[in-house]
Every structure is written in C-alpha cells, then in structure tokens.
Amino acid sequence: MKLIIFTGLFLFAIVSLIEAEEESGRVCIPLNGECSKSPNKCCDNINCDCYLRFEKGVQTGRPCFCTEKDVIFERDE
C-alpha cells in the first residue's frame, strides 16, 4: 500500500516538474503559433505580430501570431 502511494506521489512530482519547465520560458512558440498571451516567447528569427479584428465595425479582439521576420502580409480583396 505504501509503495502505491509513494509511486503515485513520485509520478505527480514528475508531471509537475515537466509542466513547470514548459512554463518557465524554455519552450518557444513555433511559426504560426498564437502568441497573444506571451508575445516575447516566439522562437528565434520569428516575431509576434498582432492585428485588430472587427465585426460590424466593433473591435472584437486582438489576435497575435508568430510570423517570420521582415515578411509583410497584404489583405486580399
């Protein structure tokens, strides 16, 4: 019984450490990944670009995505 409890606590500690490592900033956001909540965590040579979103003239959000540096996107009409 003690072995089962010890094993469960050990596995819980391992999972907690893995999650803490991911949140510590060592993991970067890849190309086209959303960076709205953490704009400084895009991988190397990638920028976090944001745009305003409007629906019926009302701003509904400000989504941000990791995009390549020095790339300009134009709107298709």
Swiss-Prot record:
Residues 1-20 form the signal peptide. It comes from the Eukaryota. It holds the Pfam family Toxin_35. One of its GO terms (molecular function) is ion channel inhibitor activity. Its main location: secreted. Residues 21-26 form a propeptide. It is found in: Secreted. Belongs to the neurotoxin 19 (CSTX) family. 09 (U10-Lctx) subfamily. This is U10-lycotoxin-Ls1d. It comes from Lycosa singoriensis (Wolf spider).
